Amino acid sequence: MKKRLLMGLLVLLSSVTNVANAALELIITDGIDSARPIAIVPFKWQGTKALPVDISSVVASDLQRSGKFSPVPTSKMPQTPYNESEINFDAWTNLGVDTLLTGSVTQNEKGEYVINYQLVDVVRGQLTSGQSRALEDGQLVLSKDHVLFNKVATITAPRMREYAHRISDLIYEQLTGERGAFLTRIAYVVVNDKDKFPYQLRVADYDGFNERLVLRSKQPLMSPAWSPDGRQLAYVSFQNGQAEIFVLNIYTGEHEKLTSFPRHNGAPRFSPDGKKLAIVLSKTGSLQIYTLDLQTRQLTQITRDRSNNTEPFWHPDGKSLIFTSDRGGKPQIYRVNLSDGSTSRLTWQGSQNLGGQITPDGRFLIMVNRSDSGFNLAKQDLETGAVQVLTKTLLDESPSIAPNGGMVIYSSIYDKKNVLSMVSIDGRFKARLPATNGRVRAPAWSPFL
């Protein structure tokens, strides 16, 4: 059933079109009160032309967005050391900084960029004056145990921003023990009524850079969802006059229609192992949740009642689904065990709760919570039931969690149009990614790539 998109639905093949370097502009809307101070010193550049990317700026922005770190502004840095031997440890500890990144960039004869960088424990360096010694083969040698890592990489200009995100991931993991999610992407739908193809599915780096158009249509596109390997997107298209579910290979442009049952086909979501899709169909009347085996095409009905059941999301262990249902009168979030069909209600605080997702560690439920203040993102501890409202934006919807569980991207209203917003999982850091050429909806954060 594989075929190329026709007429009104165009896939941009092999070399996907670069829409803009940063069509989504990230704007910080709320700072961090108690995040860990860190110094990301501007890298020394030993060249004649400007660097293609300011590596230290990308790294500092990444770490700030995590909500866990507060990079020292360059204007407040007491010095700009380019390697660990130049660090004045007392000057940095007086600022409350316990960790510092320093580095330099040179260019080799091939035109490639050689990046040397070090992450330094400033407090340890202060204690030892950077001159600690350790016994090695019966000899006392300089250990430099204040250097947490010392790395060298050779890259080309087009990969420089990508590698800056890689450095951010390394720092994040070194200091938190958790994997960083800065080398990831987001997919989203842009709607521009003035465009010949007003509905566009785009993919960008998580921070909005390197945006690329992968699909465009004259009819609505909805609900993009990543496969676990990051190579495919499931989505809903109205190209043929009704909602149908497709899957698209974002590298080859191949797409395949998966379901076209009467009435509604929607809300696709890949299982953690990538072998199944959870979907919503209304072929028997009300909205019901099914799973579709992607190899055998076997369809299994999960919910069976007269209420509307939608927005399925897989528990990380793949053994249950959470979903939104109006079986109690108003939308609330429930959990169904796939082995025996037993169902339990998860949400009780707020008049409505919908759009639920579970963090990768299984600890928290992220959802859209309706209260007297409107529709806002909230986090519920699945063990204690405690609920924390994370946002104060307007008409929040479609939350999507980073693969490490540290951030959430979602759609909200700003300046009377849909934009993408971002909030750290603890609610301390908030940012907005407004599009310059349309309304942006239905974000989906990729898996680790």
Curated annotation (Swiss-Prot):
Gene3D superfamilies registered for this protein in UniProt: TolB, C-terminal domain, TolB, N-terminal domain
Keyword presence, Transferase: no
CC terms in the record's Gene Ontology section: periplasmic space
One GO biological process term: protein import
Key word Lipoprotein present: no
Domain of life of the source: Bacteria
Signal peptide span: 1-22
InterPro entries: 6-blade_b-propeller_TolB-like, PD40, Tol-Pal_TolB, TolB_N
SUPFAM superfamilies attached to this UniProt entry: TolB, N-terminal domain, Tricorn protease N-terminal domain
Cellular compartment(s): Periplasm
PANTHER family (alphabetical): PROTEIN TOLB, PROTEIN TOLB HOMOLOG
The protein's name: Tol-Pal system protein TolB
Source organism (scientific name): Vibrio vulnificus (strain YJ016)
Gene: tolB
